Amino acid sequence: MTIGIVSYGAYVPRYRIKVEEIARVWGDDANALKSGLMVYEKSVPDIDEDAATIAVEAARYAMTRSGVDPERIGAVYTGSESHPYAVKPTSTIVSQAIGATPNMTAADFEFACKAGTAAVQACMGLVSSGMIDLGMAIGADVSQGAPGDALEYTAAAGGVACLIGKKESELAAIIEDTYSFTTDTPDFWRREGMPYPEHGGRFTGEPGYFKHVTNGAKGLLNKLGTKPEDYDYAVFHQPNGKFPTKAAKTLGFTKAQIAPGLVVPKIGNTYSGSCLMGIAATLDQAKPGDRIFATAFGSGAGSDAFSITVTDRIEEIRNRAPTVSELIKDPIYIDYARYAKHKGKIRRS
């Protein structure tokens, strides 16, 4: 049975803060940070934006592109590590907003930055089993980093929604297969009630990101019998610009393959939206027949790899909603004081 992406939608807040502005406040070397992270600015949510509003915007764009009846959607799953409520599903808010309720199921997912791709896999399973016609999988975050922490230079806001289905005439991209690699690795964590996450800093790269991304990617390549050169594009989770570039090189992918989907330098790490944002940016310019290799990563830790082939329908739906490049254009730059207010780092007494 053929399973794939019927439609997709992305959303990125317009507000941005430059690395130089954050470095100015904390007395850090902005040039060294930009060179090391390969990130130059990041997206900042407005005061009234959170993971739920971002998920709704992305889902609405996906529905605009698809042209399908929302009542056909049998499941909405939202992955995030910044759900606005500890007890109250983000996914029910999204479901109601897009007109999918009430004859459907909804749930929230958590797995650090790969909660969105875990939701994609869950929708794939439900669609392929025949339990539902269409499933909406979303990755959205308004990620946090403690003041002065290294994460503050990259923790950003954004989200992507993917409508998953099986009717071949509706598919904009076919998901050929998926593969996951998971271990118990405490590289990044936040307990209930803690405002900011903790992490192992520079010691998390090899045992966390690189171990799981490379093993997940190799697992899918071996499963399919494919090689990096069989793909036109590649997308890897983007906590910064350096990590996906290094992972691609290690696996045998080229800079040209990852360039179209490498959006982190301009918007930062959108966490659960990160890999999906790269896929969306790639779909925005891919041609029918092009193949995309993608691997998401989530701390804790695990990876989800996907092999995707673009269909003719991409040309029909692509321009029905804003592309990622259009969403990134015309940013509104803010200073650290306004950024701190938007992010809730300072509050009225």
UniProtKB/Swiss-Prot annotation:
Reaction equation(s) it catalyzes = acetoacetyl-CoA + acetyl-CoA + H2O = (3S)-3-hydroxy-3-methylglutaryl-CoA + CoA + H(+)
Traced from the root, the source organism's taxonomic lineage reads: Archaea, Methanobacteriati, Methanobacteriota, Stenosarchaea group, Methanomicrobia
Positions that bind (3S)-3-hydroxy-3-methylglutaryl-CoA: D29, A30, C113, T154, T204, H237, K246, N269, S299
This entry's Gene Ontology molecular function terms read: acetyl-CoA C-acetyltransferase activity; hydroxymethylglutaryl-CoA synthase activity
Q: How does it assemble?
A: Interacts with acetoacetyl-CoA thiolase that catalyzes the precedent step in the pathway and with a DUF35 protein. The acetoacetyl-CoA thiolase/HMG-CoA synthase complex channels the intermediate via a fused CoA-binding site, which allows for efficient coupling of the endergonic thiolase reaction with the exergonic HMGCS reaction.
Q: Would you tell me the protein name for this molecule?
A: Hydroxymethylglutaryl-CoA synthase
Pathway connected to this protein: Metabolic intermediate biosynthesis; (R)-mevalonate biosynthesis; (R)-mevalonate from acetyl-CoA: step 2/3
Could you tell me which CDD domains the record lists for this protein? init_cond_enzymes
NCBIfam families cross-referenced by the UniProt entry: HMG_CoA_syn_Arc (TIGR00748), PRK04262.1 (NF003274)
Q: Where does CoA bind?
A: R202, K242
The record, for SUPFAM superfamilies, names: Thiolase-like
One GO term under biological process is: isopentenyl diphosphate biosynthetic process, mevalonate pathway
What are the EC numbers?
2.3.3.10
Where do the catalytic residues lie? E81 (proton donor/acceptor), C113 (acyl-thioester intermediate), H237 (proton donor/acceptor)
Which domain of life does this protein belong to?
Archaea
